[in-house]
């Protein structure tokens, strides 16, 4: 009697295992597909997250997302369990002020990972109790009443920028990239607010110690993993990966840790002066001590100030100036409003001088709307009981999200010209303006709204009048202006020439 050859048996077993694996995969894909089959979207996005990863890798995900919404409507399936939303009236439901609608694993990838594990931060924390513990003690520091006394720090940094522009460029007719200098300003402002000292970007006219490049590389590297967070756990955020490749975010935390350690040593030695006592790091340390919180809280708070606080303000500053220079009529209207505002504080207009100027407000709102710093959907997990938006039901566990880039261009809300710069859209009735402001998702919404939004507005309403009144900028080639989106939005190529205006020369 013949017996089956062992190799034949092995081959048969292998074929069975392959068939079982394929059957399991087919059942899984069908199950995933059917769960949200009532929601339209690209075919491959219904069964895999790989299209989302590809979109992010192109650096044009924001434009792809907008095109998909134009094709499929307000509700589009971006992944097997991820749905993108566009209608601004749904913002209060997706981002409520109450607890219960949690952030997705998207944010886990944005937390810097150290040899001791991931560092929780106000922005990236998904656990609502952890978030409340981090945000609660410092929330009052970011209220407008607490932010306004920091105006003196902004003025000092404006003064440094002005001296650099006057000394390097205004008299020489030399071309320079205004985008870079606005980023230098934004980072030095946050350095001054946080540590009572600038990083030195403005004085040196360069990326000091590669800080800006380090932060950008961290964000750019994390962006694709936001679409497939489980891969990030395998590839980056575990003990083995840390030993082999080094921990993600360590270089940024090293910068933060250096400043924090230096301040702690100065405090112990009694070397803190009255100015330093007013900066945010000193306040963070005082809050941590008074509330008996772990020391890493100070690091987490400071990390958020340095990264999100600086880069996001720089994006909006560049948007304001690029569009003012590209649309001279709006620049002239803004300058006329500033010159007609009455006696202005010298050498730079104060917050009180400009806080209620309608066209300045319109230009800043339009910049916040047109180019938000964050251009991927803010993801949330549908809670128990599901969620209904319009006539669409979303089962529990579905990930939903709204992209500021897409929502801020909602034509029924902002007009048919929502893709272009038009500050006049804000020079409307109080009711319509309020409706549109509520639809701008740039700072997020609900209980996770951006803590630093008042600081950003203070910076913008200080730097824009100061530069518009003092200088005439000539944009060399508007076509050289480029953008890229890796979660954070970045603009480059704002080559300009600058000269002082006659009124500035006369001290008016």
From Swiss-Prot:
One of its GO terms (cellular component) is membrane. Its cofactor is heme. Its main location: membrane. Pathway: Secondary metabolite biosynthesis. It is a single-pass membrane protein. Heme binds at residue 450. It comes from the Eukaryota. The chain crosses the membrane at residues 9-29. GO terms for molecular function: heme binding; iron ion binding; monooxygenase activity; oxidoreductase activity, acting on paired donors, with incorporation or reduction of molecular oxygen. Keywords: Glycoprotein, Heme, Iron, Membrane, Metal-binding, Monooxygenase, Oxidoreductase, Transmembrane, Transmembrane helix. It is an enzyme of class 1 (oxidoreductase). InterPro entries: Cyt_P450, Cyt_P450_CS, Cyt_P450_E_grp-IV, Cyt_P450_sf, Cytochrome_P450_monoxygenase. It is found in: Membrane. Its EC number is 1.-.-.-. Gene3D superfamilies: Cytochrome P450 (1.10.630.10). Disruption phenotype: Abolishes the production of aspernidine A, but accumulates the intermediate aspernidine D. Belongs to the cytochrome P450 family. This is Cytochrome P450 monooxygenase pkfB. It comes from Emericella nidulans (strain FGSC A4 / ATCC 38163 / CBS 112.46 / NRRL 194 / M139). The gene is pkfkB.
């Amino acid at each position: 009697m013949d017996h089956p050859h062992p190799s034949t048996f092995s081959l048969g077993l292998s074929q069975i295992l392959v068939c079982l694996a394929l059957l399991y995969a087919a059942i899984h894909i069908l199950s995933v597909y059917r769960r949200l089959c009532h929601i339209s979207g690209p075919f491959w996005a219904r069964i895999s997250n790989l299209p989302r990863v590809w979109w992010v890798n192109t650096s044009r995900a924001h434009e792809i997302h907008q095109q998909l919404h134009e094709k499929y409507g307000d509700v589009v399936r971006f992944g097997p369990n991820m749905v993108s939303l566009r209608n601004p009236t749904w913002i209060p439901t997706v981002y409520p002020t109450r607890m219960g609608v949690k952030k997705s694993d998207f944010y886990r990838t944005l937390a810097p990972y150290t040899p001791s594990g991931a560092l929780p931060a106000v922005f990236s924390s998904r656990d609502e109790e952890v978030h409340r513990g981090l945000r609660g003690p410092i929330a009052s520091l970011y209220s407008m009443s607490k932010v306004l006394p920091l105006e003196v720090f902004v003025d000092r940094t404006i003064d440094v920028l002005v001296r650099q522009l006057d000394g390097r460029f205004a008299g020489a007719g030399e071309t320079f990239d205004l985008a870079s200098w606005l980023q230098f300003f934004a980072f030095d402002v946050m350095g001054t607010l946080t540590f009572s000292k600038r990083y030195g970007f403005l004085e040196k006219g360069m990326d000091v110690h590669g800080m800006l490049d380090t932060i950008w590389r961290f964000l750019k590297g994390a962006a694709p993993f936001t679409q497939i967070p489980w891969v990030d756990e395998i590839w980056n955020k575990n003990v083995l990966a840390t030993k082999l490749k080094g921990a993600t975010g360590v270089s940024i935390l090293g910068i933060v840790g250096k400043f924090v350690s230096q301040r702690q040593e100065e405090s112990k030695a009694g070397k803190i002066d009255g100015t330093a006592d007013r900066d945010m790091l000193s306040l963070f340390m005082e809050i941590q001590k008074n509330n008996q919180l772990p020391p890493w809280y100070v690091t987490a708070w400071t990390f958020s100030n340095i990264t999100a606080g600086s880069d996001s303000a720089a994006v909006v500053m560049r948007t304001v100036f690029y569009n003012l220079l590209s649309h001279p009529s709006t620049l002239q209207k803004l300058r006329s409003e500033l010159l007609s505002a009455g006696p202005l504080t010298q050498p730079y207009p104060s917050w009180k001088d400009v806080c209620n100027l309608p066209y300045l407000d319109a230009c800043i709102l339009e910049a916040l709307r047109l180019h938000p710093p964050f251009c991927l959907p803010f993801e949330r997990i549908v809670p128990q009981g599901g969620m209904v938006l319009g006539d669409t039901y979303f089962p529990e566990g579905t990930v939903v999200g709204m992209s500021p880039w897409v929502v801020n261009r909602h034509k029924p809300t902002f007009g048919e010209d929502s893709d272009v710069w038009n500050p006049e859209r804000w020079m409307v009735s109080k009711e319509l303006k309020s409706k549109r402001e509520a639809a701008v998702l740039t700072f997020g919404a609900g209980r996770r709204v951006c803590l630093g939004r008042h600081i950003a507005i203070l910076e913008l309403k200080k730097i824009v009048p100061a530069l518009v009144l003092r200088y005439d900028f000539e944009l060399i080639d508007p076509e050289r202006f480029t953008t890229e989106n890796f979660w954070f939005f970045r603009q480059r190529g704002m080559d300009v020439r600058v000269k002082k205006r006659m009124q500035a020369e006369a001290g008016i």
